[in-house]
Amino acid sequence: MVREKVRVSTRTLQWKCVESREDSKRLYYGRFILSPLRKGQADTIAIGIRRALLGEIEGTCITRVKSKNVPHEYSTIAGIQESVHEILMNFKEIVLRSNLYGTCDASICVRGPGYVTAQDIILPPYVEIVDNTQHIASLTEPIDLCIGLQIERNRGYLMKMPHNSQDGSYPIDAVFMPVRNANHSIHSYGSGNEKHEILFLEIWTNGSLTPKEALHEACRNLIDLFIPFLHKEEETSPLEDNHHTVPLSPLTFHDKADKLRKRKKEIKKKIALKSIFIDQSELPKVYNCLKGSNLYTLLDLLNKSQEDLMKMEHLRLEDVNHILVILARKHFAIYLPNKKFEIDFEIYCYSIFFH
């Protein structure tokens, strides 16, 4: 066994990648260290990160296959070497990378004879295949193979439900996890009261994310989960004096926004905007437009005007409204009354985020 020498910090907590490699298009490996940690801290951090890596990161999969004139899943088709079931299993193995929000459609239309591979799939522009060589079927005769596909972005597992195959639709068990495996080890050094720990973290991914990207996303998800605990339970809302509703006079949009914008400074003091990332569940796919412009946190949004956002490619006004409404509902709910209230969330969002 070869002992490796790894230089670590003895003062400031630091992390770094000590090994990174691409074993194949569908297998990436990365090894990271975090130090110095006090006794017990390494295990606490490792357990949380490993669970987040395996359960909190979203992935993209083919979840349904549609084809006419197929009697059942275990039937065979003349001119195709594989059974329908084998073709479904081949679709299950295809690794996708996407900026998708929810579901979308794709298709294959190929004429034999020849091999059908992942590169024959016709995809929307925001979905790409990690390995185009993945095998789907072998056509032994000059027949047409036309298949419709449903693609979904989600997390964890999706078990196929009982279905009626008469419509030619077949669900597929989906594994949305981009991280194939994650291990950790802990090494101690020092003595007495100066004893510390080094955390080694190993990550394997399916190629849709690099191990470093997976680690960053897992950490962001953990931060999002812990943020509510940073706020006092008795903390009240700046809107609480208005009871159930916020009366909106028949003013122009800008007048309403100016009126609500005065509360921005107070809200900013109460929320660690710098620590709230916007790539959370239930956010629309337009987040990827923001990400492309290096907007990751709510604080990043604060530094942009409405005009700045509207200049971004593929971003429409209704998209901006939608994402800000969701962010307001999710991150500012702790400052609103517990009882049901009525408020124009779009105006509320604009009053906070736009100067």
Curated annotation (Swiss-Prot):
It catalyses: RNA(n) + a ribonucleoside 5'-triphosphate = RNA(n+1) + diphosphate. Its main location: plastid. GO terms for cellular component: chloroplast; DNA-directed RNA polymerase complex; mitochondrion. GO terms for molecular function: DNA binding; DNA-directed RNA polymerase activity; protein dimerization activity. Belongs to the RNA polymerase alpha chain family. DNA-dependent RNA polymerase catalyzes the transcription of DNA into RNA using the four ribonucleoside triphosphates as substrates. This is DNA-directed RNA polymerase subunit alpha. It comes from Jasminum nudiflorum. The lineage of its organism: Eukaryota, Viridiplantae, Streptophyta, Embryophyta, Tracheophyta.
